[in-house]
Curated annotation (Swiss-Prot):
Gene Ontology CC, one term: cytosol
Organism: Mycolicibacterium vanbaalenii (strain DSM 7251 / JCM 13017 / BCRC 16820 / KCTC 9966 / NRRL B-24157 / PYR-1) (Mycobacterium vanbaalenii)
Quaternary state and interactors: Homodimer.
Residues noted as binding thiamine diphosphate in the record, renumbered to the chain: H71, S112, H113, A114, G145, A146, N173, Y284, E365
Top enzyme class: transferase
Protein name (database record): 1-deoxy-D-xylulose-5-phosphate synthase
Family, per entry: Belongs to the transketolase family. DXPS subfamily.
HAMAP family in alphabetical order: DXP_synth
Keywords assigned by UniProt, alphabetized: Isoprene biosynthesis, Magnesium, Metal-binding, Thiamine biosynthesis, Thiamine pyrophosphate, Transferase
MF-aspect GO terms: 1-deoxy-D-xylulose-5-phosphate synthase activity; magnesium ion binding; thiamine pyrophosphate binding
Function statement: Catalyzes the acyloin condensation reaction between C atoms 2 and 3 of pyruvate and glyceraldehyde 3-phosphate to yield 1-deoxy-D-xylulose-5-phosphate (DXP).
Tagged with keyword Transferase: yes
Pfam families: DXP_synthase_N, Transket_pyr, Transketolase_C
Required cofactor names: Mg(2+); thiamine diphosphate
């Protein structure tokens, strides 16, 4: 049956029995396709019936359906004609793991950063009203913790103040809400959604209040009783107090019930919340039995067992986790904070070992940063572990609440640089540019596991301001020993005997391995290269300027955007000291990169050892620092 679904219109003629069969097919399809590519499995298994109902009730794309977060949108993609593309999920030139307007007119927003869809919905509803499109509904599906983000409640406050047709579907796949009791609550919820209910209610208010002497008193008594019953029976007070209509909770795996609720909500033609309770990982035993996160996201797995088909080597995240636990065992002032991601950021083990010193604040990076500031004021040393891409949300708090007060808060940025398969919104290529403008901020970029352990310890010894440590996703690789340490800078390679000091190659973090490979290529062409790892990359260590005076060209190599990164900082530091040595940078272009593997993205922008060696050769030749173009070109090719 799934093969016959080319678009939402094909769902309209299906019977309830056929919809149930289709739901089973969709789950089987998801399990086998995501098992082969990796992706967000658990959340999508939980929204099958909900997504079917959404596309039967609303007219997408005429009625925008916005997913928050977008990793819940796999079934939506399937029902809008993209089943055939799932073999390429999260691969180069393939299907995105999030909604993508480049893929389909049914995808309005990319929505991989949580808690934003309601603000989009508010804006779209206003735009439709101003354009005279009064028959268009905007649907926001908010779930997987997105409602723990403050931006959602800012948007709800604005949506509630209008009469615009915004339908807010709360996909509750956790245990945040208690179940509603009995049929009376269901009756109240259904009644409140009837379009004529408000008219009748208003007439009743006027009639009771019009009774001489006791009318207002009677109305207030009746209203108080109604509110008390409502709050006792339904977990809706947080919405109704804002002025939003509410229905639910609805069994999210009963397609007929969900569809009925959505049709009532649509007919109301004003802001309404539909509370749908779903089970993450529904229908797949390995996910349902995963107590940690119901297989929220997985790599390539065996679809029968749910087990990974290969075991990765030691990763950056696990190395950080082990190091933090070791240090916390020696110091009771070390506390850890995460924004709803204890597993992905490596803090689950810390939570288990030190539960009283671990704080999961939900999807609330802004609160996380200022709460960390308060902890630091109280004598603790907080470690805030988040993905690099989510640092953007906490910039004001980091600048004004942490740095302004010179507080010892350590921010650990996982998934820095190019992450790859999750696409543009998850690449952590902005952090150095952001951190570089924060007064008093010190930033480390470890090149290997040994340096991560070392620099984490150094960060936790800082007591007069904030620190940050950034590292990428994936395996940590082999340790890269230094020849010597000059000041705070590790020297990894020097020109061979008899060669001149032509190029100072400044490698940021894990790009140290690439820098050494580039130096080998250049040595074969007679170009002498010194490779250094600054370790603490911002502010630029003094030793970099000293080393620069001995070379003819300085080149920085980093996986940050070219504007505002280490390259810009090194160039600025040399200008400040009036050191007249040319600087060049090999960095990421300042643009958004589509999903692909990390290696594919780096290759597409020329950040490979061969291409960088060719670039440096050209720069050296242009400066007249070494051999002629023709001889160099022959060696490069």
């Amino acid at each position: 049956m799934l093969e016959q679904i080319r678009g939402p219109a094909d769902l309209q003629h299906l019977s309830q029995a056929q919809l149930e069969d289709l739901a089973h097919e969709i789950r089987d399809f998801l399990i086998h396709k995501v098992a082969a590519t990796g992706g967000h499995l658990g959340p999508n298994l939980g929204v099958v019936e909900l997504t079917l109902a959404l596309h039967r009730v609303f007219d997408s794309p005429h009625d925008p359906i916005l997913f928050d977060t977008g990793h819940q949108a796999y079934v939506h993609k399937m029902l809008t004609g993209r089943c055939r593309d799932f073999d390429s999920l999260r691969k180069k030139d393939g299907l995105s793991g999030y909604p993508s307007s480049a893929e389909s007119e049914h995808d309005w927003i990319e929505s991989s950063h949580a808690s934003s869809a309601l603000s989009y919905a508010d804006g779209l509803a206003k735009a439709f009203e101003l354009s005279g499109h009064r028959n268009r509904h905007v649907v926001a599906v908010v779930g997987d913790g997105a409602l723990t983000g403050g931006m959602c409640w800012e948007a709800l406050n604005n949506i509630a103040a209008s009469r615009r047709p915004v339908v807010i579907v709360v996909n509750d796949n956790g245990r945040s809400y208690a179940p509603t009791i009995g049929g009376f609550a269901e009756h109240l919820a259904g009644l409140r959604l009837q379009p004529g209910y408000e008219r009748v209610l208003e007439e009743g208010r006027k009639a009771v209040r019009g009774v001489p002497m006791i009318g207002e008193f009677c109305y207030q008594c009746m209203h108080s009783i109604k509110v008390g019953i409502k709050d006792a029976l339904s977990p809706q007070v947080m919405f109704t107090d804002l002025g939003l209509k509410y229905v639910g909770p609805i069994d999210g795996h009963d397609e007929h019930a969900v569809e009925s609720a959505l049709r009532h909500a649509r007919a109301f033609n004003a802001p309404v919340v539909v509370h749908v309770v779903t089970r993450k990982g529904m229908g797949y035993a390995p996910a349902e039995n995963d107590a940690d996160d119901q297989m929220h996201a997985c790599g390539v797995i065996d679809p029968e067992t749910g087990l990974a088909t290969s075991v990765p080597g030691p990763g950056w995240t696990s190395t950080f986790s082990e190091a933090l636990i070791r240090l916390a065992g020696k110091r009771r002032d070390i506390v850890a904070i995460t924004a709803a991601m204890p597993g992905p950021t490596g803090l689950s083990a810390f939570r288990d070992r030190f539960p009283d010193r671990f704080f999961d604040v939900g999807i609330a990076e802004q609160h996380a940063m200022t709460s960390a500031a308060g902890l630091a004021m109280g004598g603790m040393h907080p470690v805030v572990a988040i993905y690099s891409t989510f640092l953007n949300r906490a910039f004001d708090q980091m600048l004004m609440d942490v740095a302004l007060h010179k507080l010892p808060v350590t921010v650990v940025l996982d998934r820095s640089g190019v992450t790859g398969p999750d696409g543009a919104s998850h690449n952590g290529m902005w952090d150095l540019s952001i951190l570089g403008i924060v007064p008093g901020m010190r930033v480390a970029a470890p090149r290997d596991g040994a340096r991560l352990r070392e620099e984490l310890g150094e960060a936790l010894d800082v007591s007069d301001g904030p620190t940050a440590i950034r590292f990428p996703k994936g395996d940590v690789g082999e340790d890269i020993p230094a020849i010597e340490r000059r000041g705070d800078v590790d020297v990894l390679a020097v020109p061979a005997d008899g060669m001149s000091e032509d190029v100072l190659l400044v490698a940021v973090g894990p790009f140290a391995a690439m820098a050494l490979a580039v130096a080998d290529r250049l040595r074969n062409q007679g170009i002498g290269v010194t490779v250094v790892d600054p370790r603490w990359v911002l502010p630029v260590p003094e030793e970099i300027a000293t080393l620069a005076t001995r070379h003819k060209l300085v080149v920085t190599l980093e996986d940050n955007g070219g504007h505002g990164g280490v390259g810009s900082a090194v160039s600025g530091a040399l200008r400040h000291k009036e050191i007249d040595v040319p600087c060049r940078d090999a960095a990421l272009p300042q643009e958004f990169f589509a999903h692909a593997s990390r290696g594919e993205v780096l290759e597409s922008v020329g950040l490979t050892e061969r291409n960088i060696a060719r670039q440096i050769t050209g720069w050296v030749a242009a400066l007249g620092a070494s051999t002629g173009d023709r001889e160099v070109s022959e060696h490069v090719d």
